[in-house]
């Protein structure tokens, strides 16, 4: 049996009772934290909560050695843990599919993810369009996909959730400041008047924690603001309902 369980967003207290129950029964627990990470806790605290040791896999081992993980689940009960929800990342979906192809029982335990946590903004979830990811610019790699996604969503009046790059192995987490700067750099190159310093944006910091940071304002005012420790994400709002306007006014710190 393969149990795929999410750990939630922030700390070990996000672990569900269902995950705790299965953790007691399984033979071995694996985890990966390259797609997301719980910044409010430590591996030691998670292991203490589950009362079992955890083998952490890096990106390469998850993506290229999943066969070993799946083969173990043929005659053993294996748990695979991820931050957030276990079925958000494509890699995790692939693991579940390959396990089922081999006739392995797959149990999926859902958990809070950024897709549910953005409800804290008061923005209506059905008005979010396609999600995009903003990555750290590299000398030969600076994708403009986020710009195109925002452009297409704005045409339809939709909000855009921008996930920010995570390089957990380097302990490097893109800040909202860096994400906004990257978007402005793409605008500077494309010059299609999609984003500017006058564009309003929302920043969510430490989603899932007891005291998340919610900030709203023009990009020119947000870009140098200190949003505190990661993880951050950015939302470019589309057409706002009056209730959403109230949410941005009263639930957020307006910069």
Swiss-Prot record:
Ribosomal protein keyword on record: no
Highest classification ranks of the organism: Archaea, Methanobacteriati, Methanobacteriota, Methanomada group, Methanococci
Gene: dphB
HAMAP family per UniProt: Diphthine_synth
Keyword Transferase recorded: yes
Family: Belongs to the diphthine synthase family.
Organism: Methanococcus maripaludis (strain C7 / ATCC BAA-1331)
Positions of S-adenosyl-L-methionine binding: 9, 85, 88, 113-114, 164, 207, 232
Residue stretches spanning the membrane: none
Protein name (database record): Diphthine synthase
């Amino acid at each position: 049996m393969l149990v795929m369980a999410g750990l939630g967003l922030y700390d070990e207290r996000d672990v569900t009772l269902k995950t705790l129950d299965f953790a007691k029964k399984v033979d071995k627990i694996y985890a990966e934290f390259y797609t997301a990470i719980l910044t409010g806790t430590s591996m030691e605290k998670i292991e203490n909560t589950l009362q079992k040791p955890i083998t952490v896999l890096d990106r390469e081992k998850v993506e290229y050695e999943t066969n070993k993980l799946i083969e173990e689940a043929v005659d053993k009960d294996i748990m695979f843990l991820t931050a957030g929800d276990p079925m958000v990342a494509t890699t995790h979906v692939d693991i579940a599919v390959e396990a089922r192809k081999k006739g392995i029982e797959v149990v999926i335990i859902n958990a809070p993810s950024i897709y549910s946590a953005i409800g804290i903004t008061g923005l209506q979830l059905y008005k979010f369009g396609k999600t995009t990811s903003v990555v750290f610019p590299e000398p030969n790699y600076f994708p403009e996909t986020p710009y195109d996604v925002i452009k297409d969503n704005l045409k339809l009046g939709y909000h855009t959730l921008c996930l920010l790059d995570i390089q957990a192995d380097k302990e490097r987490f893109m800040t909202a400041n860096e994400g906004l700067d990257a978007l402005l750099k793409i605008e500077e190159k494309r010059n299609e008047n999609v984003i500017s310093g006058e564009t309003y944006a929302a920043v969510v910091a430490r989603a899932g924690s007891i005291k998340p940071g919610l900030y709203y304002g023009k990009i020119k005012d947000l870009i140098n603001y200190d949003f505190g420790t990661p993880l951050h994400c950015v939302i470019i709002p589309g057409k706002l309902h009056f209730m959403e306007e109230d949410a941005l006014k009263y639930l957020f710190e307006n910069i």
